[in-house]
Amino acid sequence: MRNILVIEDSPLVLKILEHLFRQEPDLEPIFCASLAEAEVMLDTSSDLFFAAIVDLHLPDAPNGESVDLVMRYHLPCIVLSGSYNEQRRDELLMKGVVDYVLKESQHSYEYAFRLLHRLDHNSHIKILIADDSDAQRHYIRHILEPHHYQIIEARDGKETLRQLNEHPDLDLLVLDHSMPGVSGFELVKLLRQKLRLNDLIIIGVSADPKGSLSAQFIKHGADDFLRKPFCPEELNCRVMSTLERRDLLRALKKAAEYDALTGLRNRRAFYEQGMQILQQAQRDSRHISVAMLDLDHFKQINDGFGHASGDSALVVFARALSSFFPDMLLGRLGGEEFALLTLHGADHVNQALEKLRQHCAGLHYAVGAPPLSFSAGLYHGEPEDLESLLHEADIRLYRAKQQGRARTVLA
């Protein structure tokens, strides 16, 4: 839960904000209607707050004193204003507020909440600023720091590559076109040969007046482009939109590859990843182990205790499976059927399956339900096509069920 300080006196604006907060269970607003109230609140409880939404003009703070108050406590500050003043906006942004939002429409207030959500995520976001100009790097850092990003700097192409190697988890690169040693184009081409589009966001920047430069940057693999000089809001909007787009693509990819109930790979993703493991085994002349697992008497669990209990059994089993086989390829192929693929030997896998079986017997998944058990078929052999390997494991799974369930058949 994140506590948000809201300093606002307008009944209409408060009504809108209260409505939006009701849709955000992770955000808890604490309202103050005046500068005096806010001073008391921050003086006694400033450590409770994650960020603040602040009206620029209050009856007892007509000149933005409420913003200055919040900034003194180093809280991320989103400013609301009923009128637009470009000079005032620039002053506030250079002072370090998160953003300056006009009270224009529902969309404006929703944008303020997007900022709150990004602030909550941004502490995990790493951004590399690559520019040979000290002044330009400091300017970009000053713009981005109020949003709680982790900022790293590089002054030339060589240092940029070094920072990328030292920080493989970098999320975004702000890259100047004209740097000593290697151009922005060359760096983008080099990085895209190693990294997929969703692994690193690249925003090119340049003071070059050529109109084709932005298109060339994007054709080389950049995600976006900014022409210098740019205003703080433009950079922040580009950074936020590219990060949100990446998050959406990752969520779509996860939904396409992972089973929504258990969190394991689905059949398609299991096959795709399995083919890569097979190719590795073929290159290294290694054998491969594959197992098919099936929950015992699953239909009886569904019929006798309800489908919610059946779902609970699947989730509990999937968690246990992931815990006992953390470095192996796992998947839910459908219903109560699971699969496992690894380069480990059959004895290693068989021993782990027996430990998993003992562990599952003590797991609780529904009141009054029988102990959780599973049957497994395990095959170890040459890395032929995946379908044949799974078929061999499935034959052994069938034998395990014929022999009374709750066992693994290998031979």
Q: What do these predicted regions represent?
A:
Residues 34, 61-65, 156, 183-187:
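Acidic catalytic/metal-coordinating carboxylates
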Residues 253-254, 267-287, 318-325:
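Short regulatory alpha-helical coupling segments
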Residues 392-411:
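Catalytic/regulatory signature loops of cyclic-dinucleotide turnover enzymes
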Residues 329-332:
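A short pre-motif secondary-structure segment
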Residues 253-272, 293-307, 315:
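Conserved nucleotide-binding and Mg2+-coordinating catalytic segments in signaling enzymes
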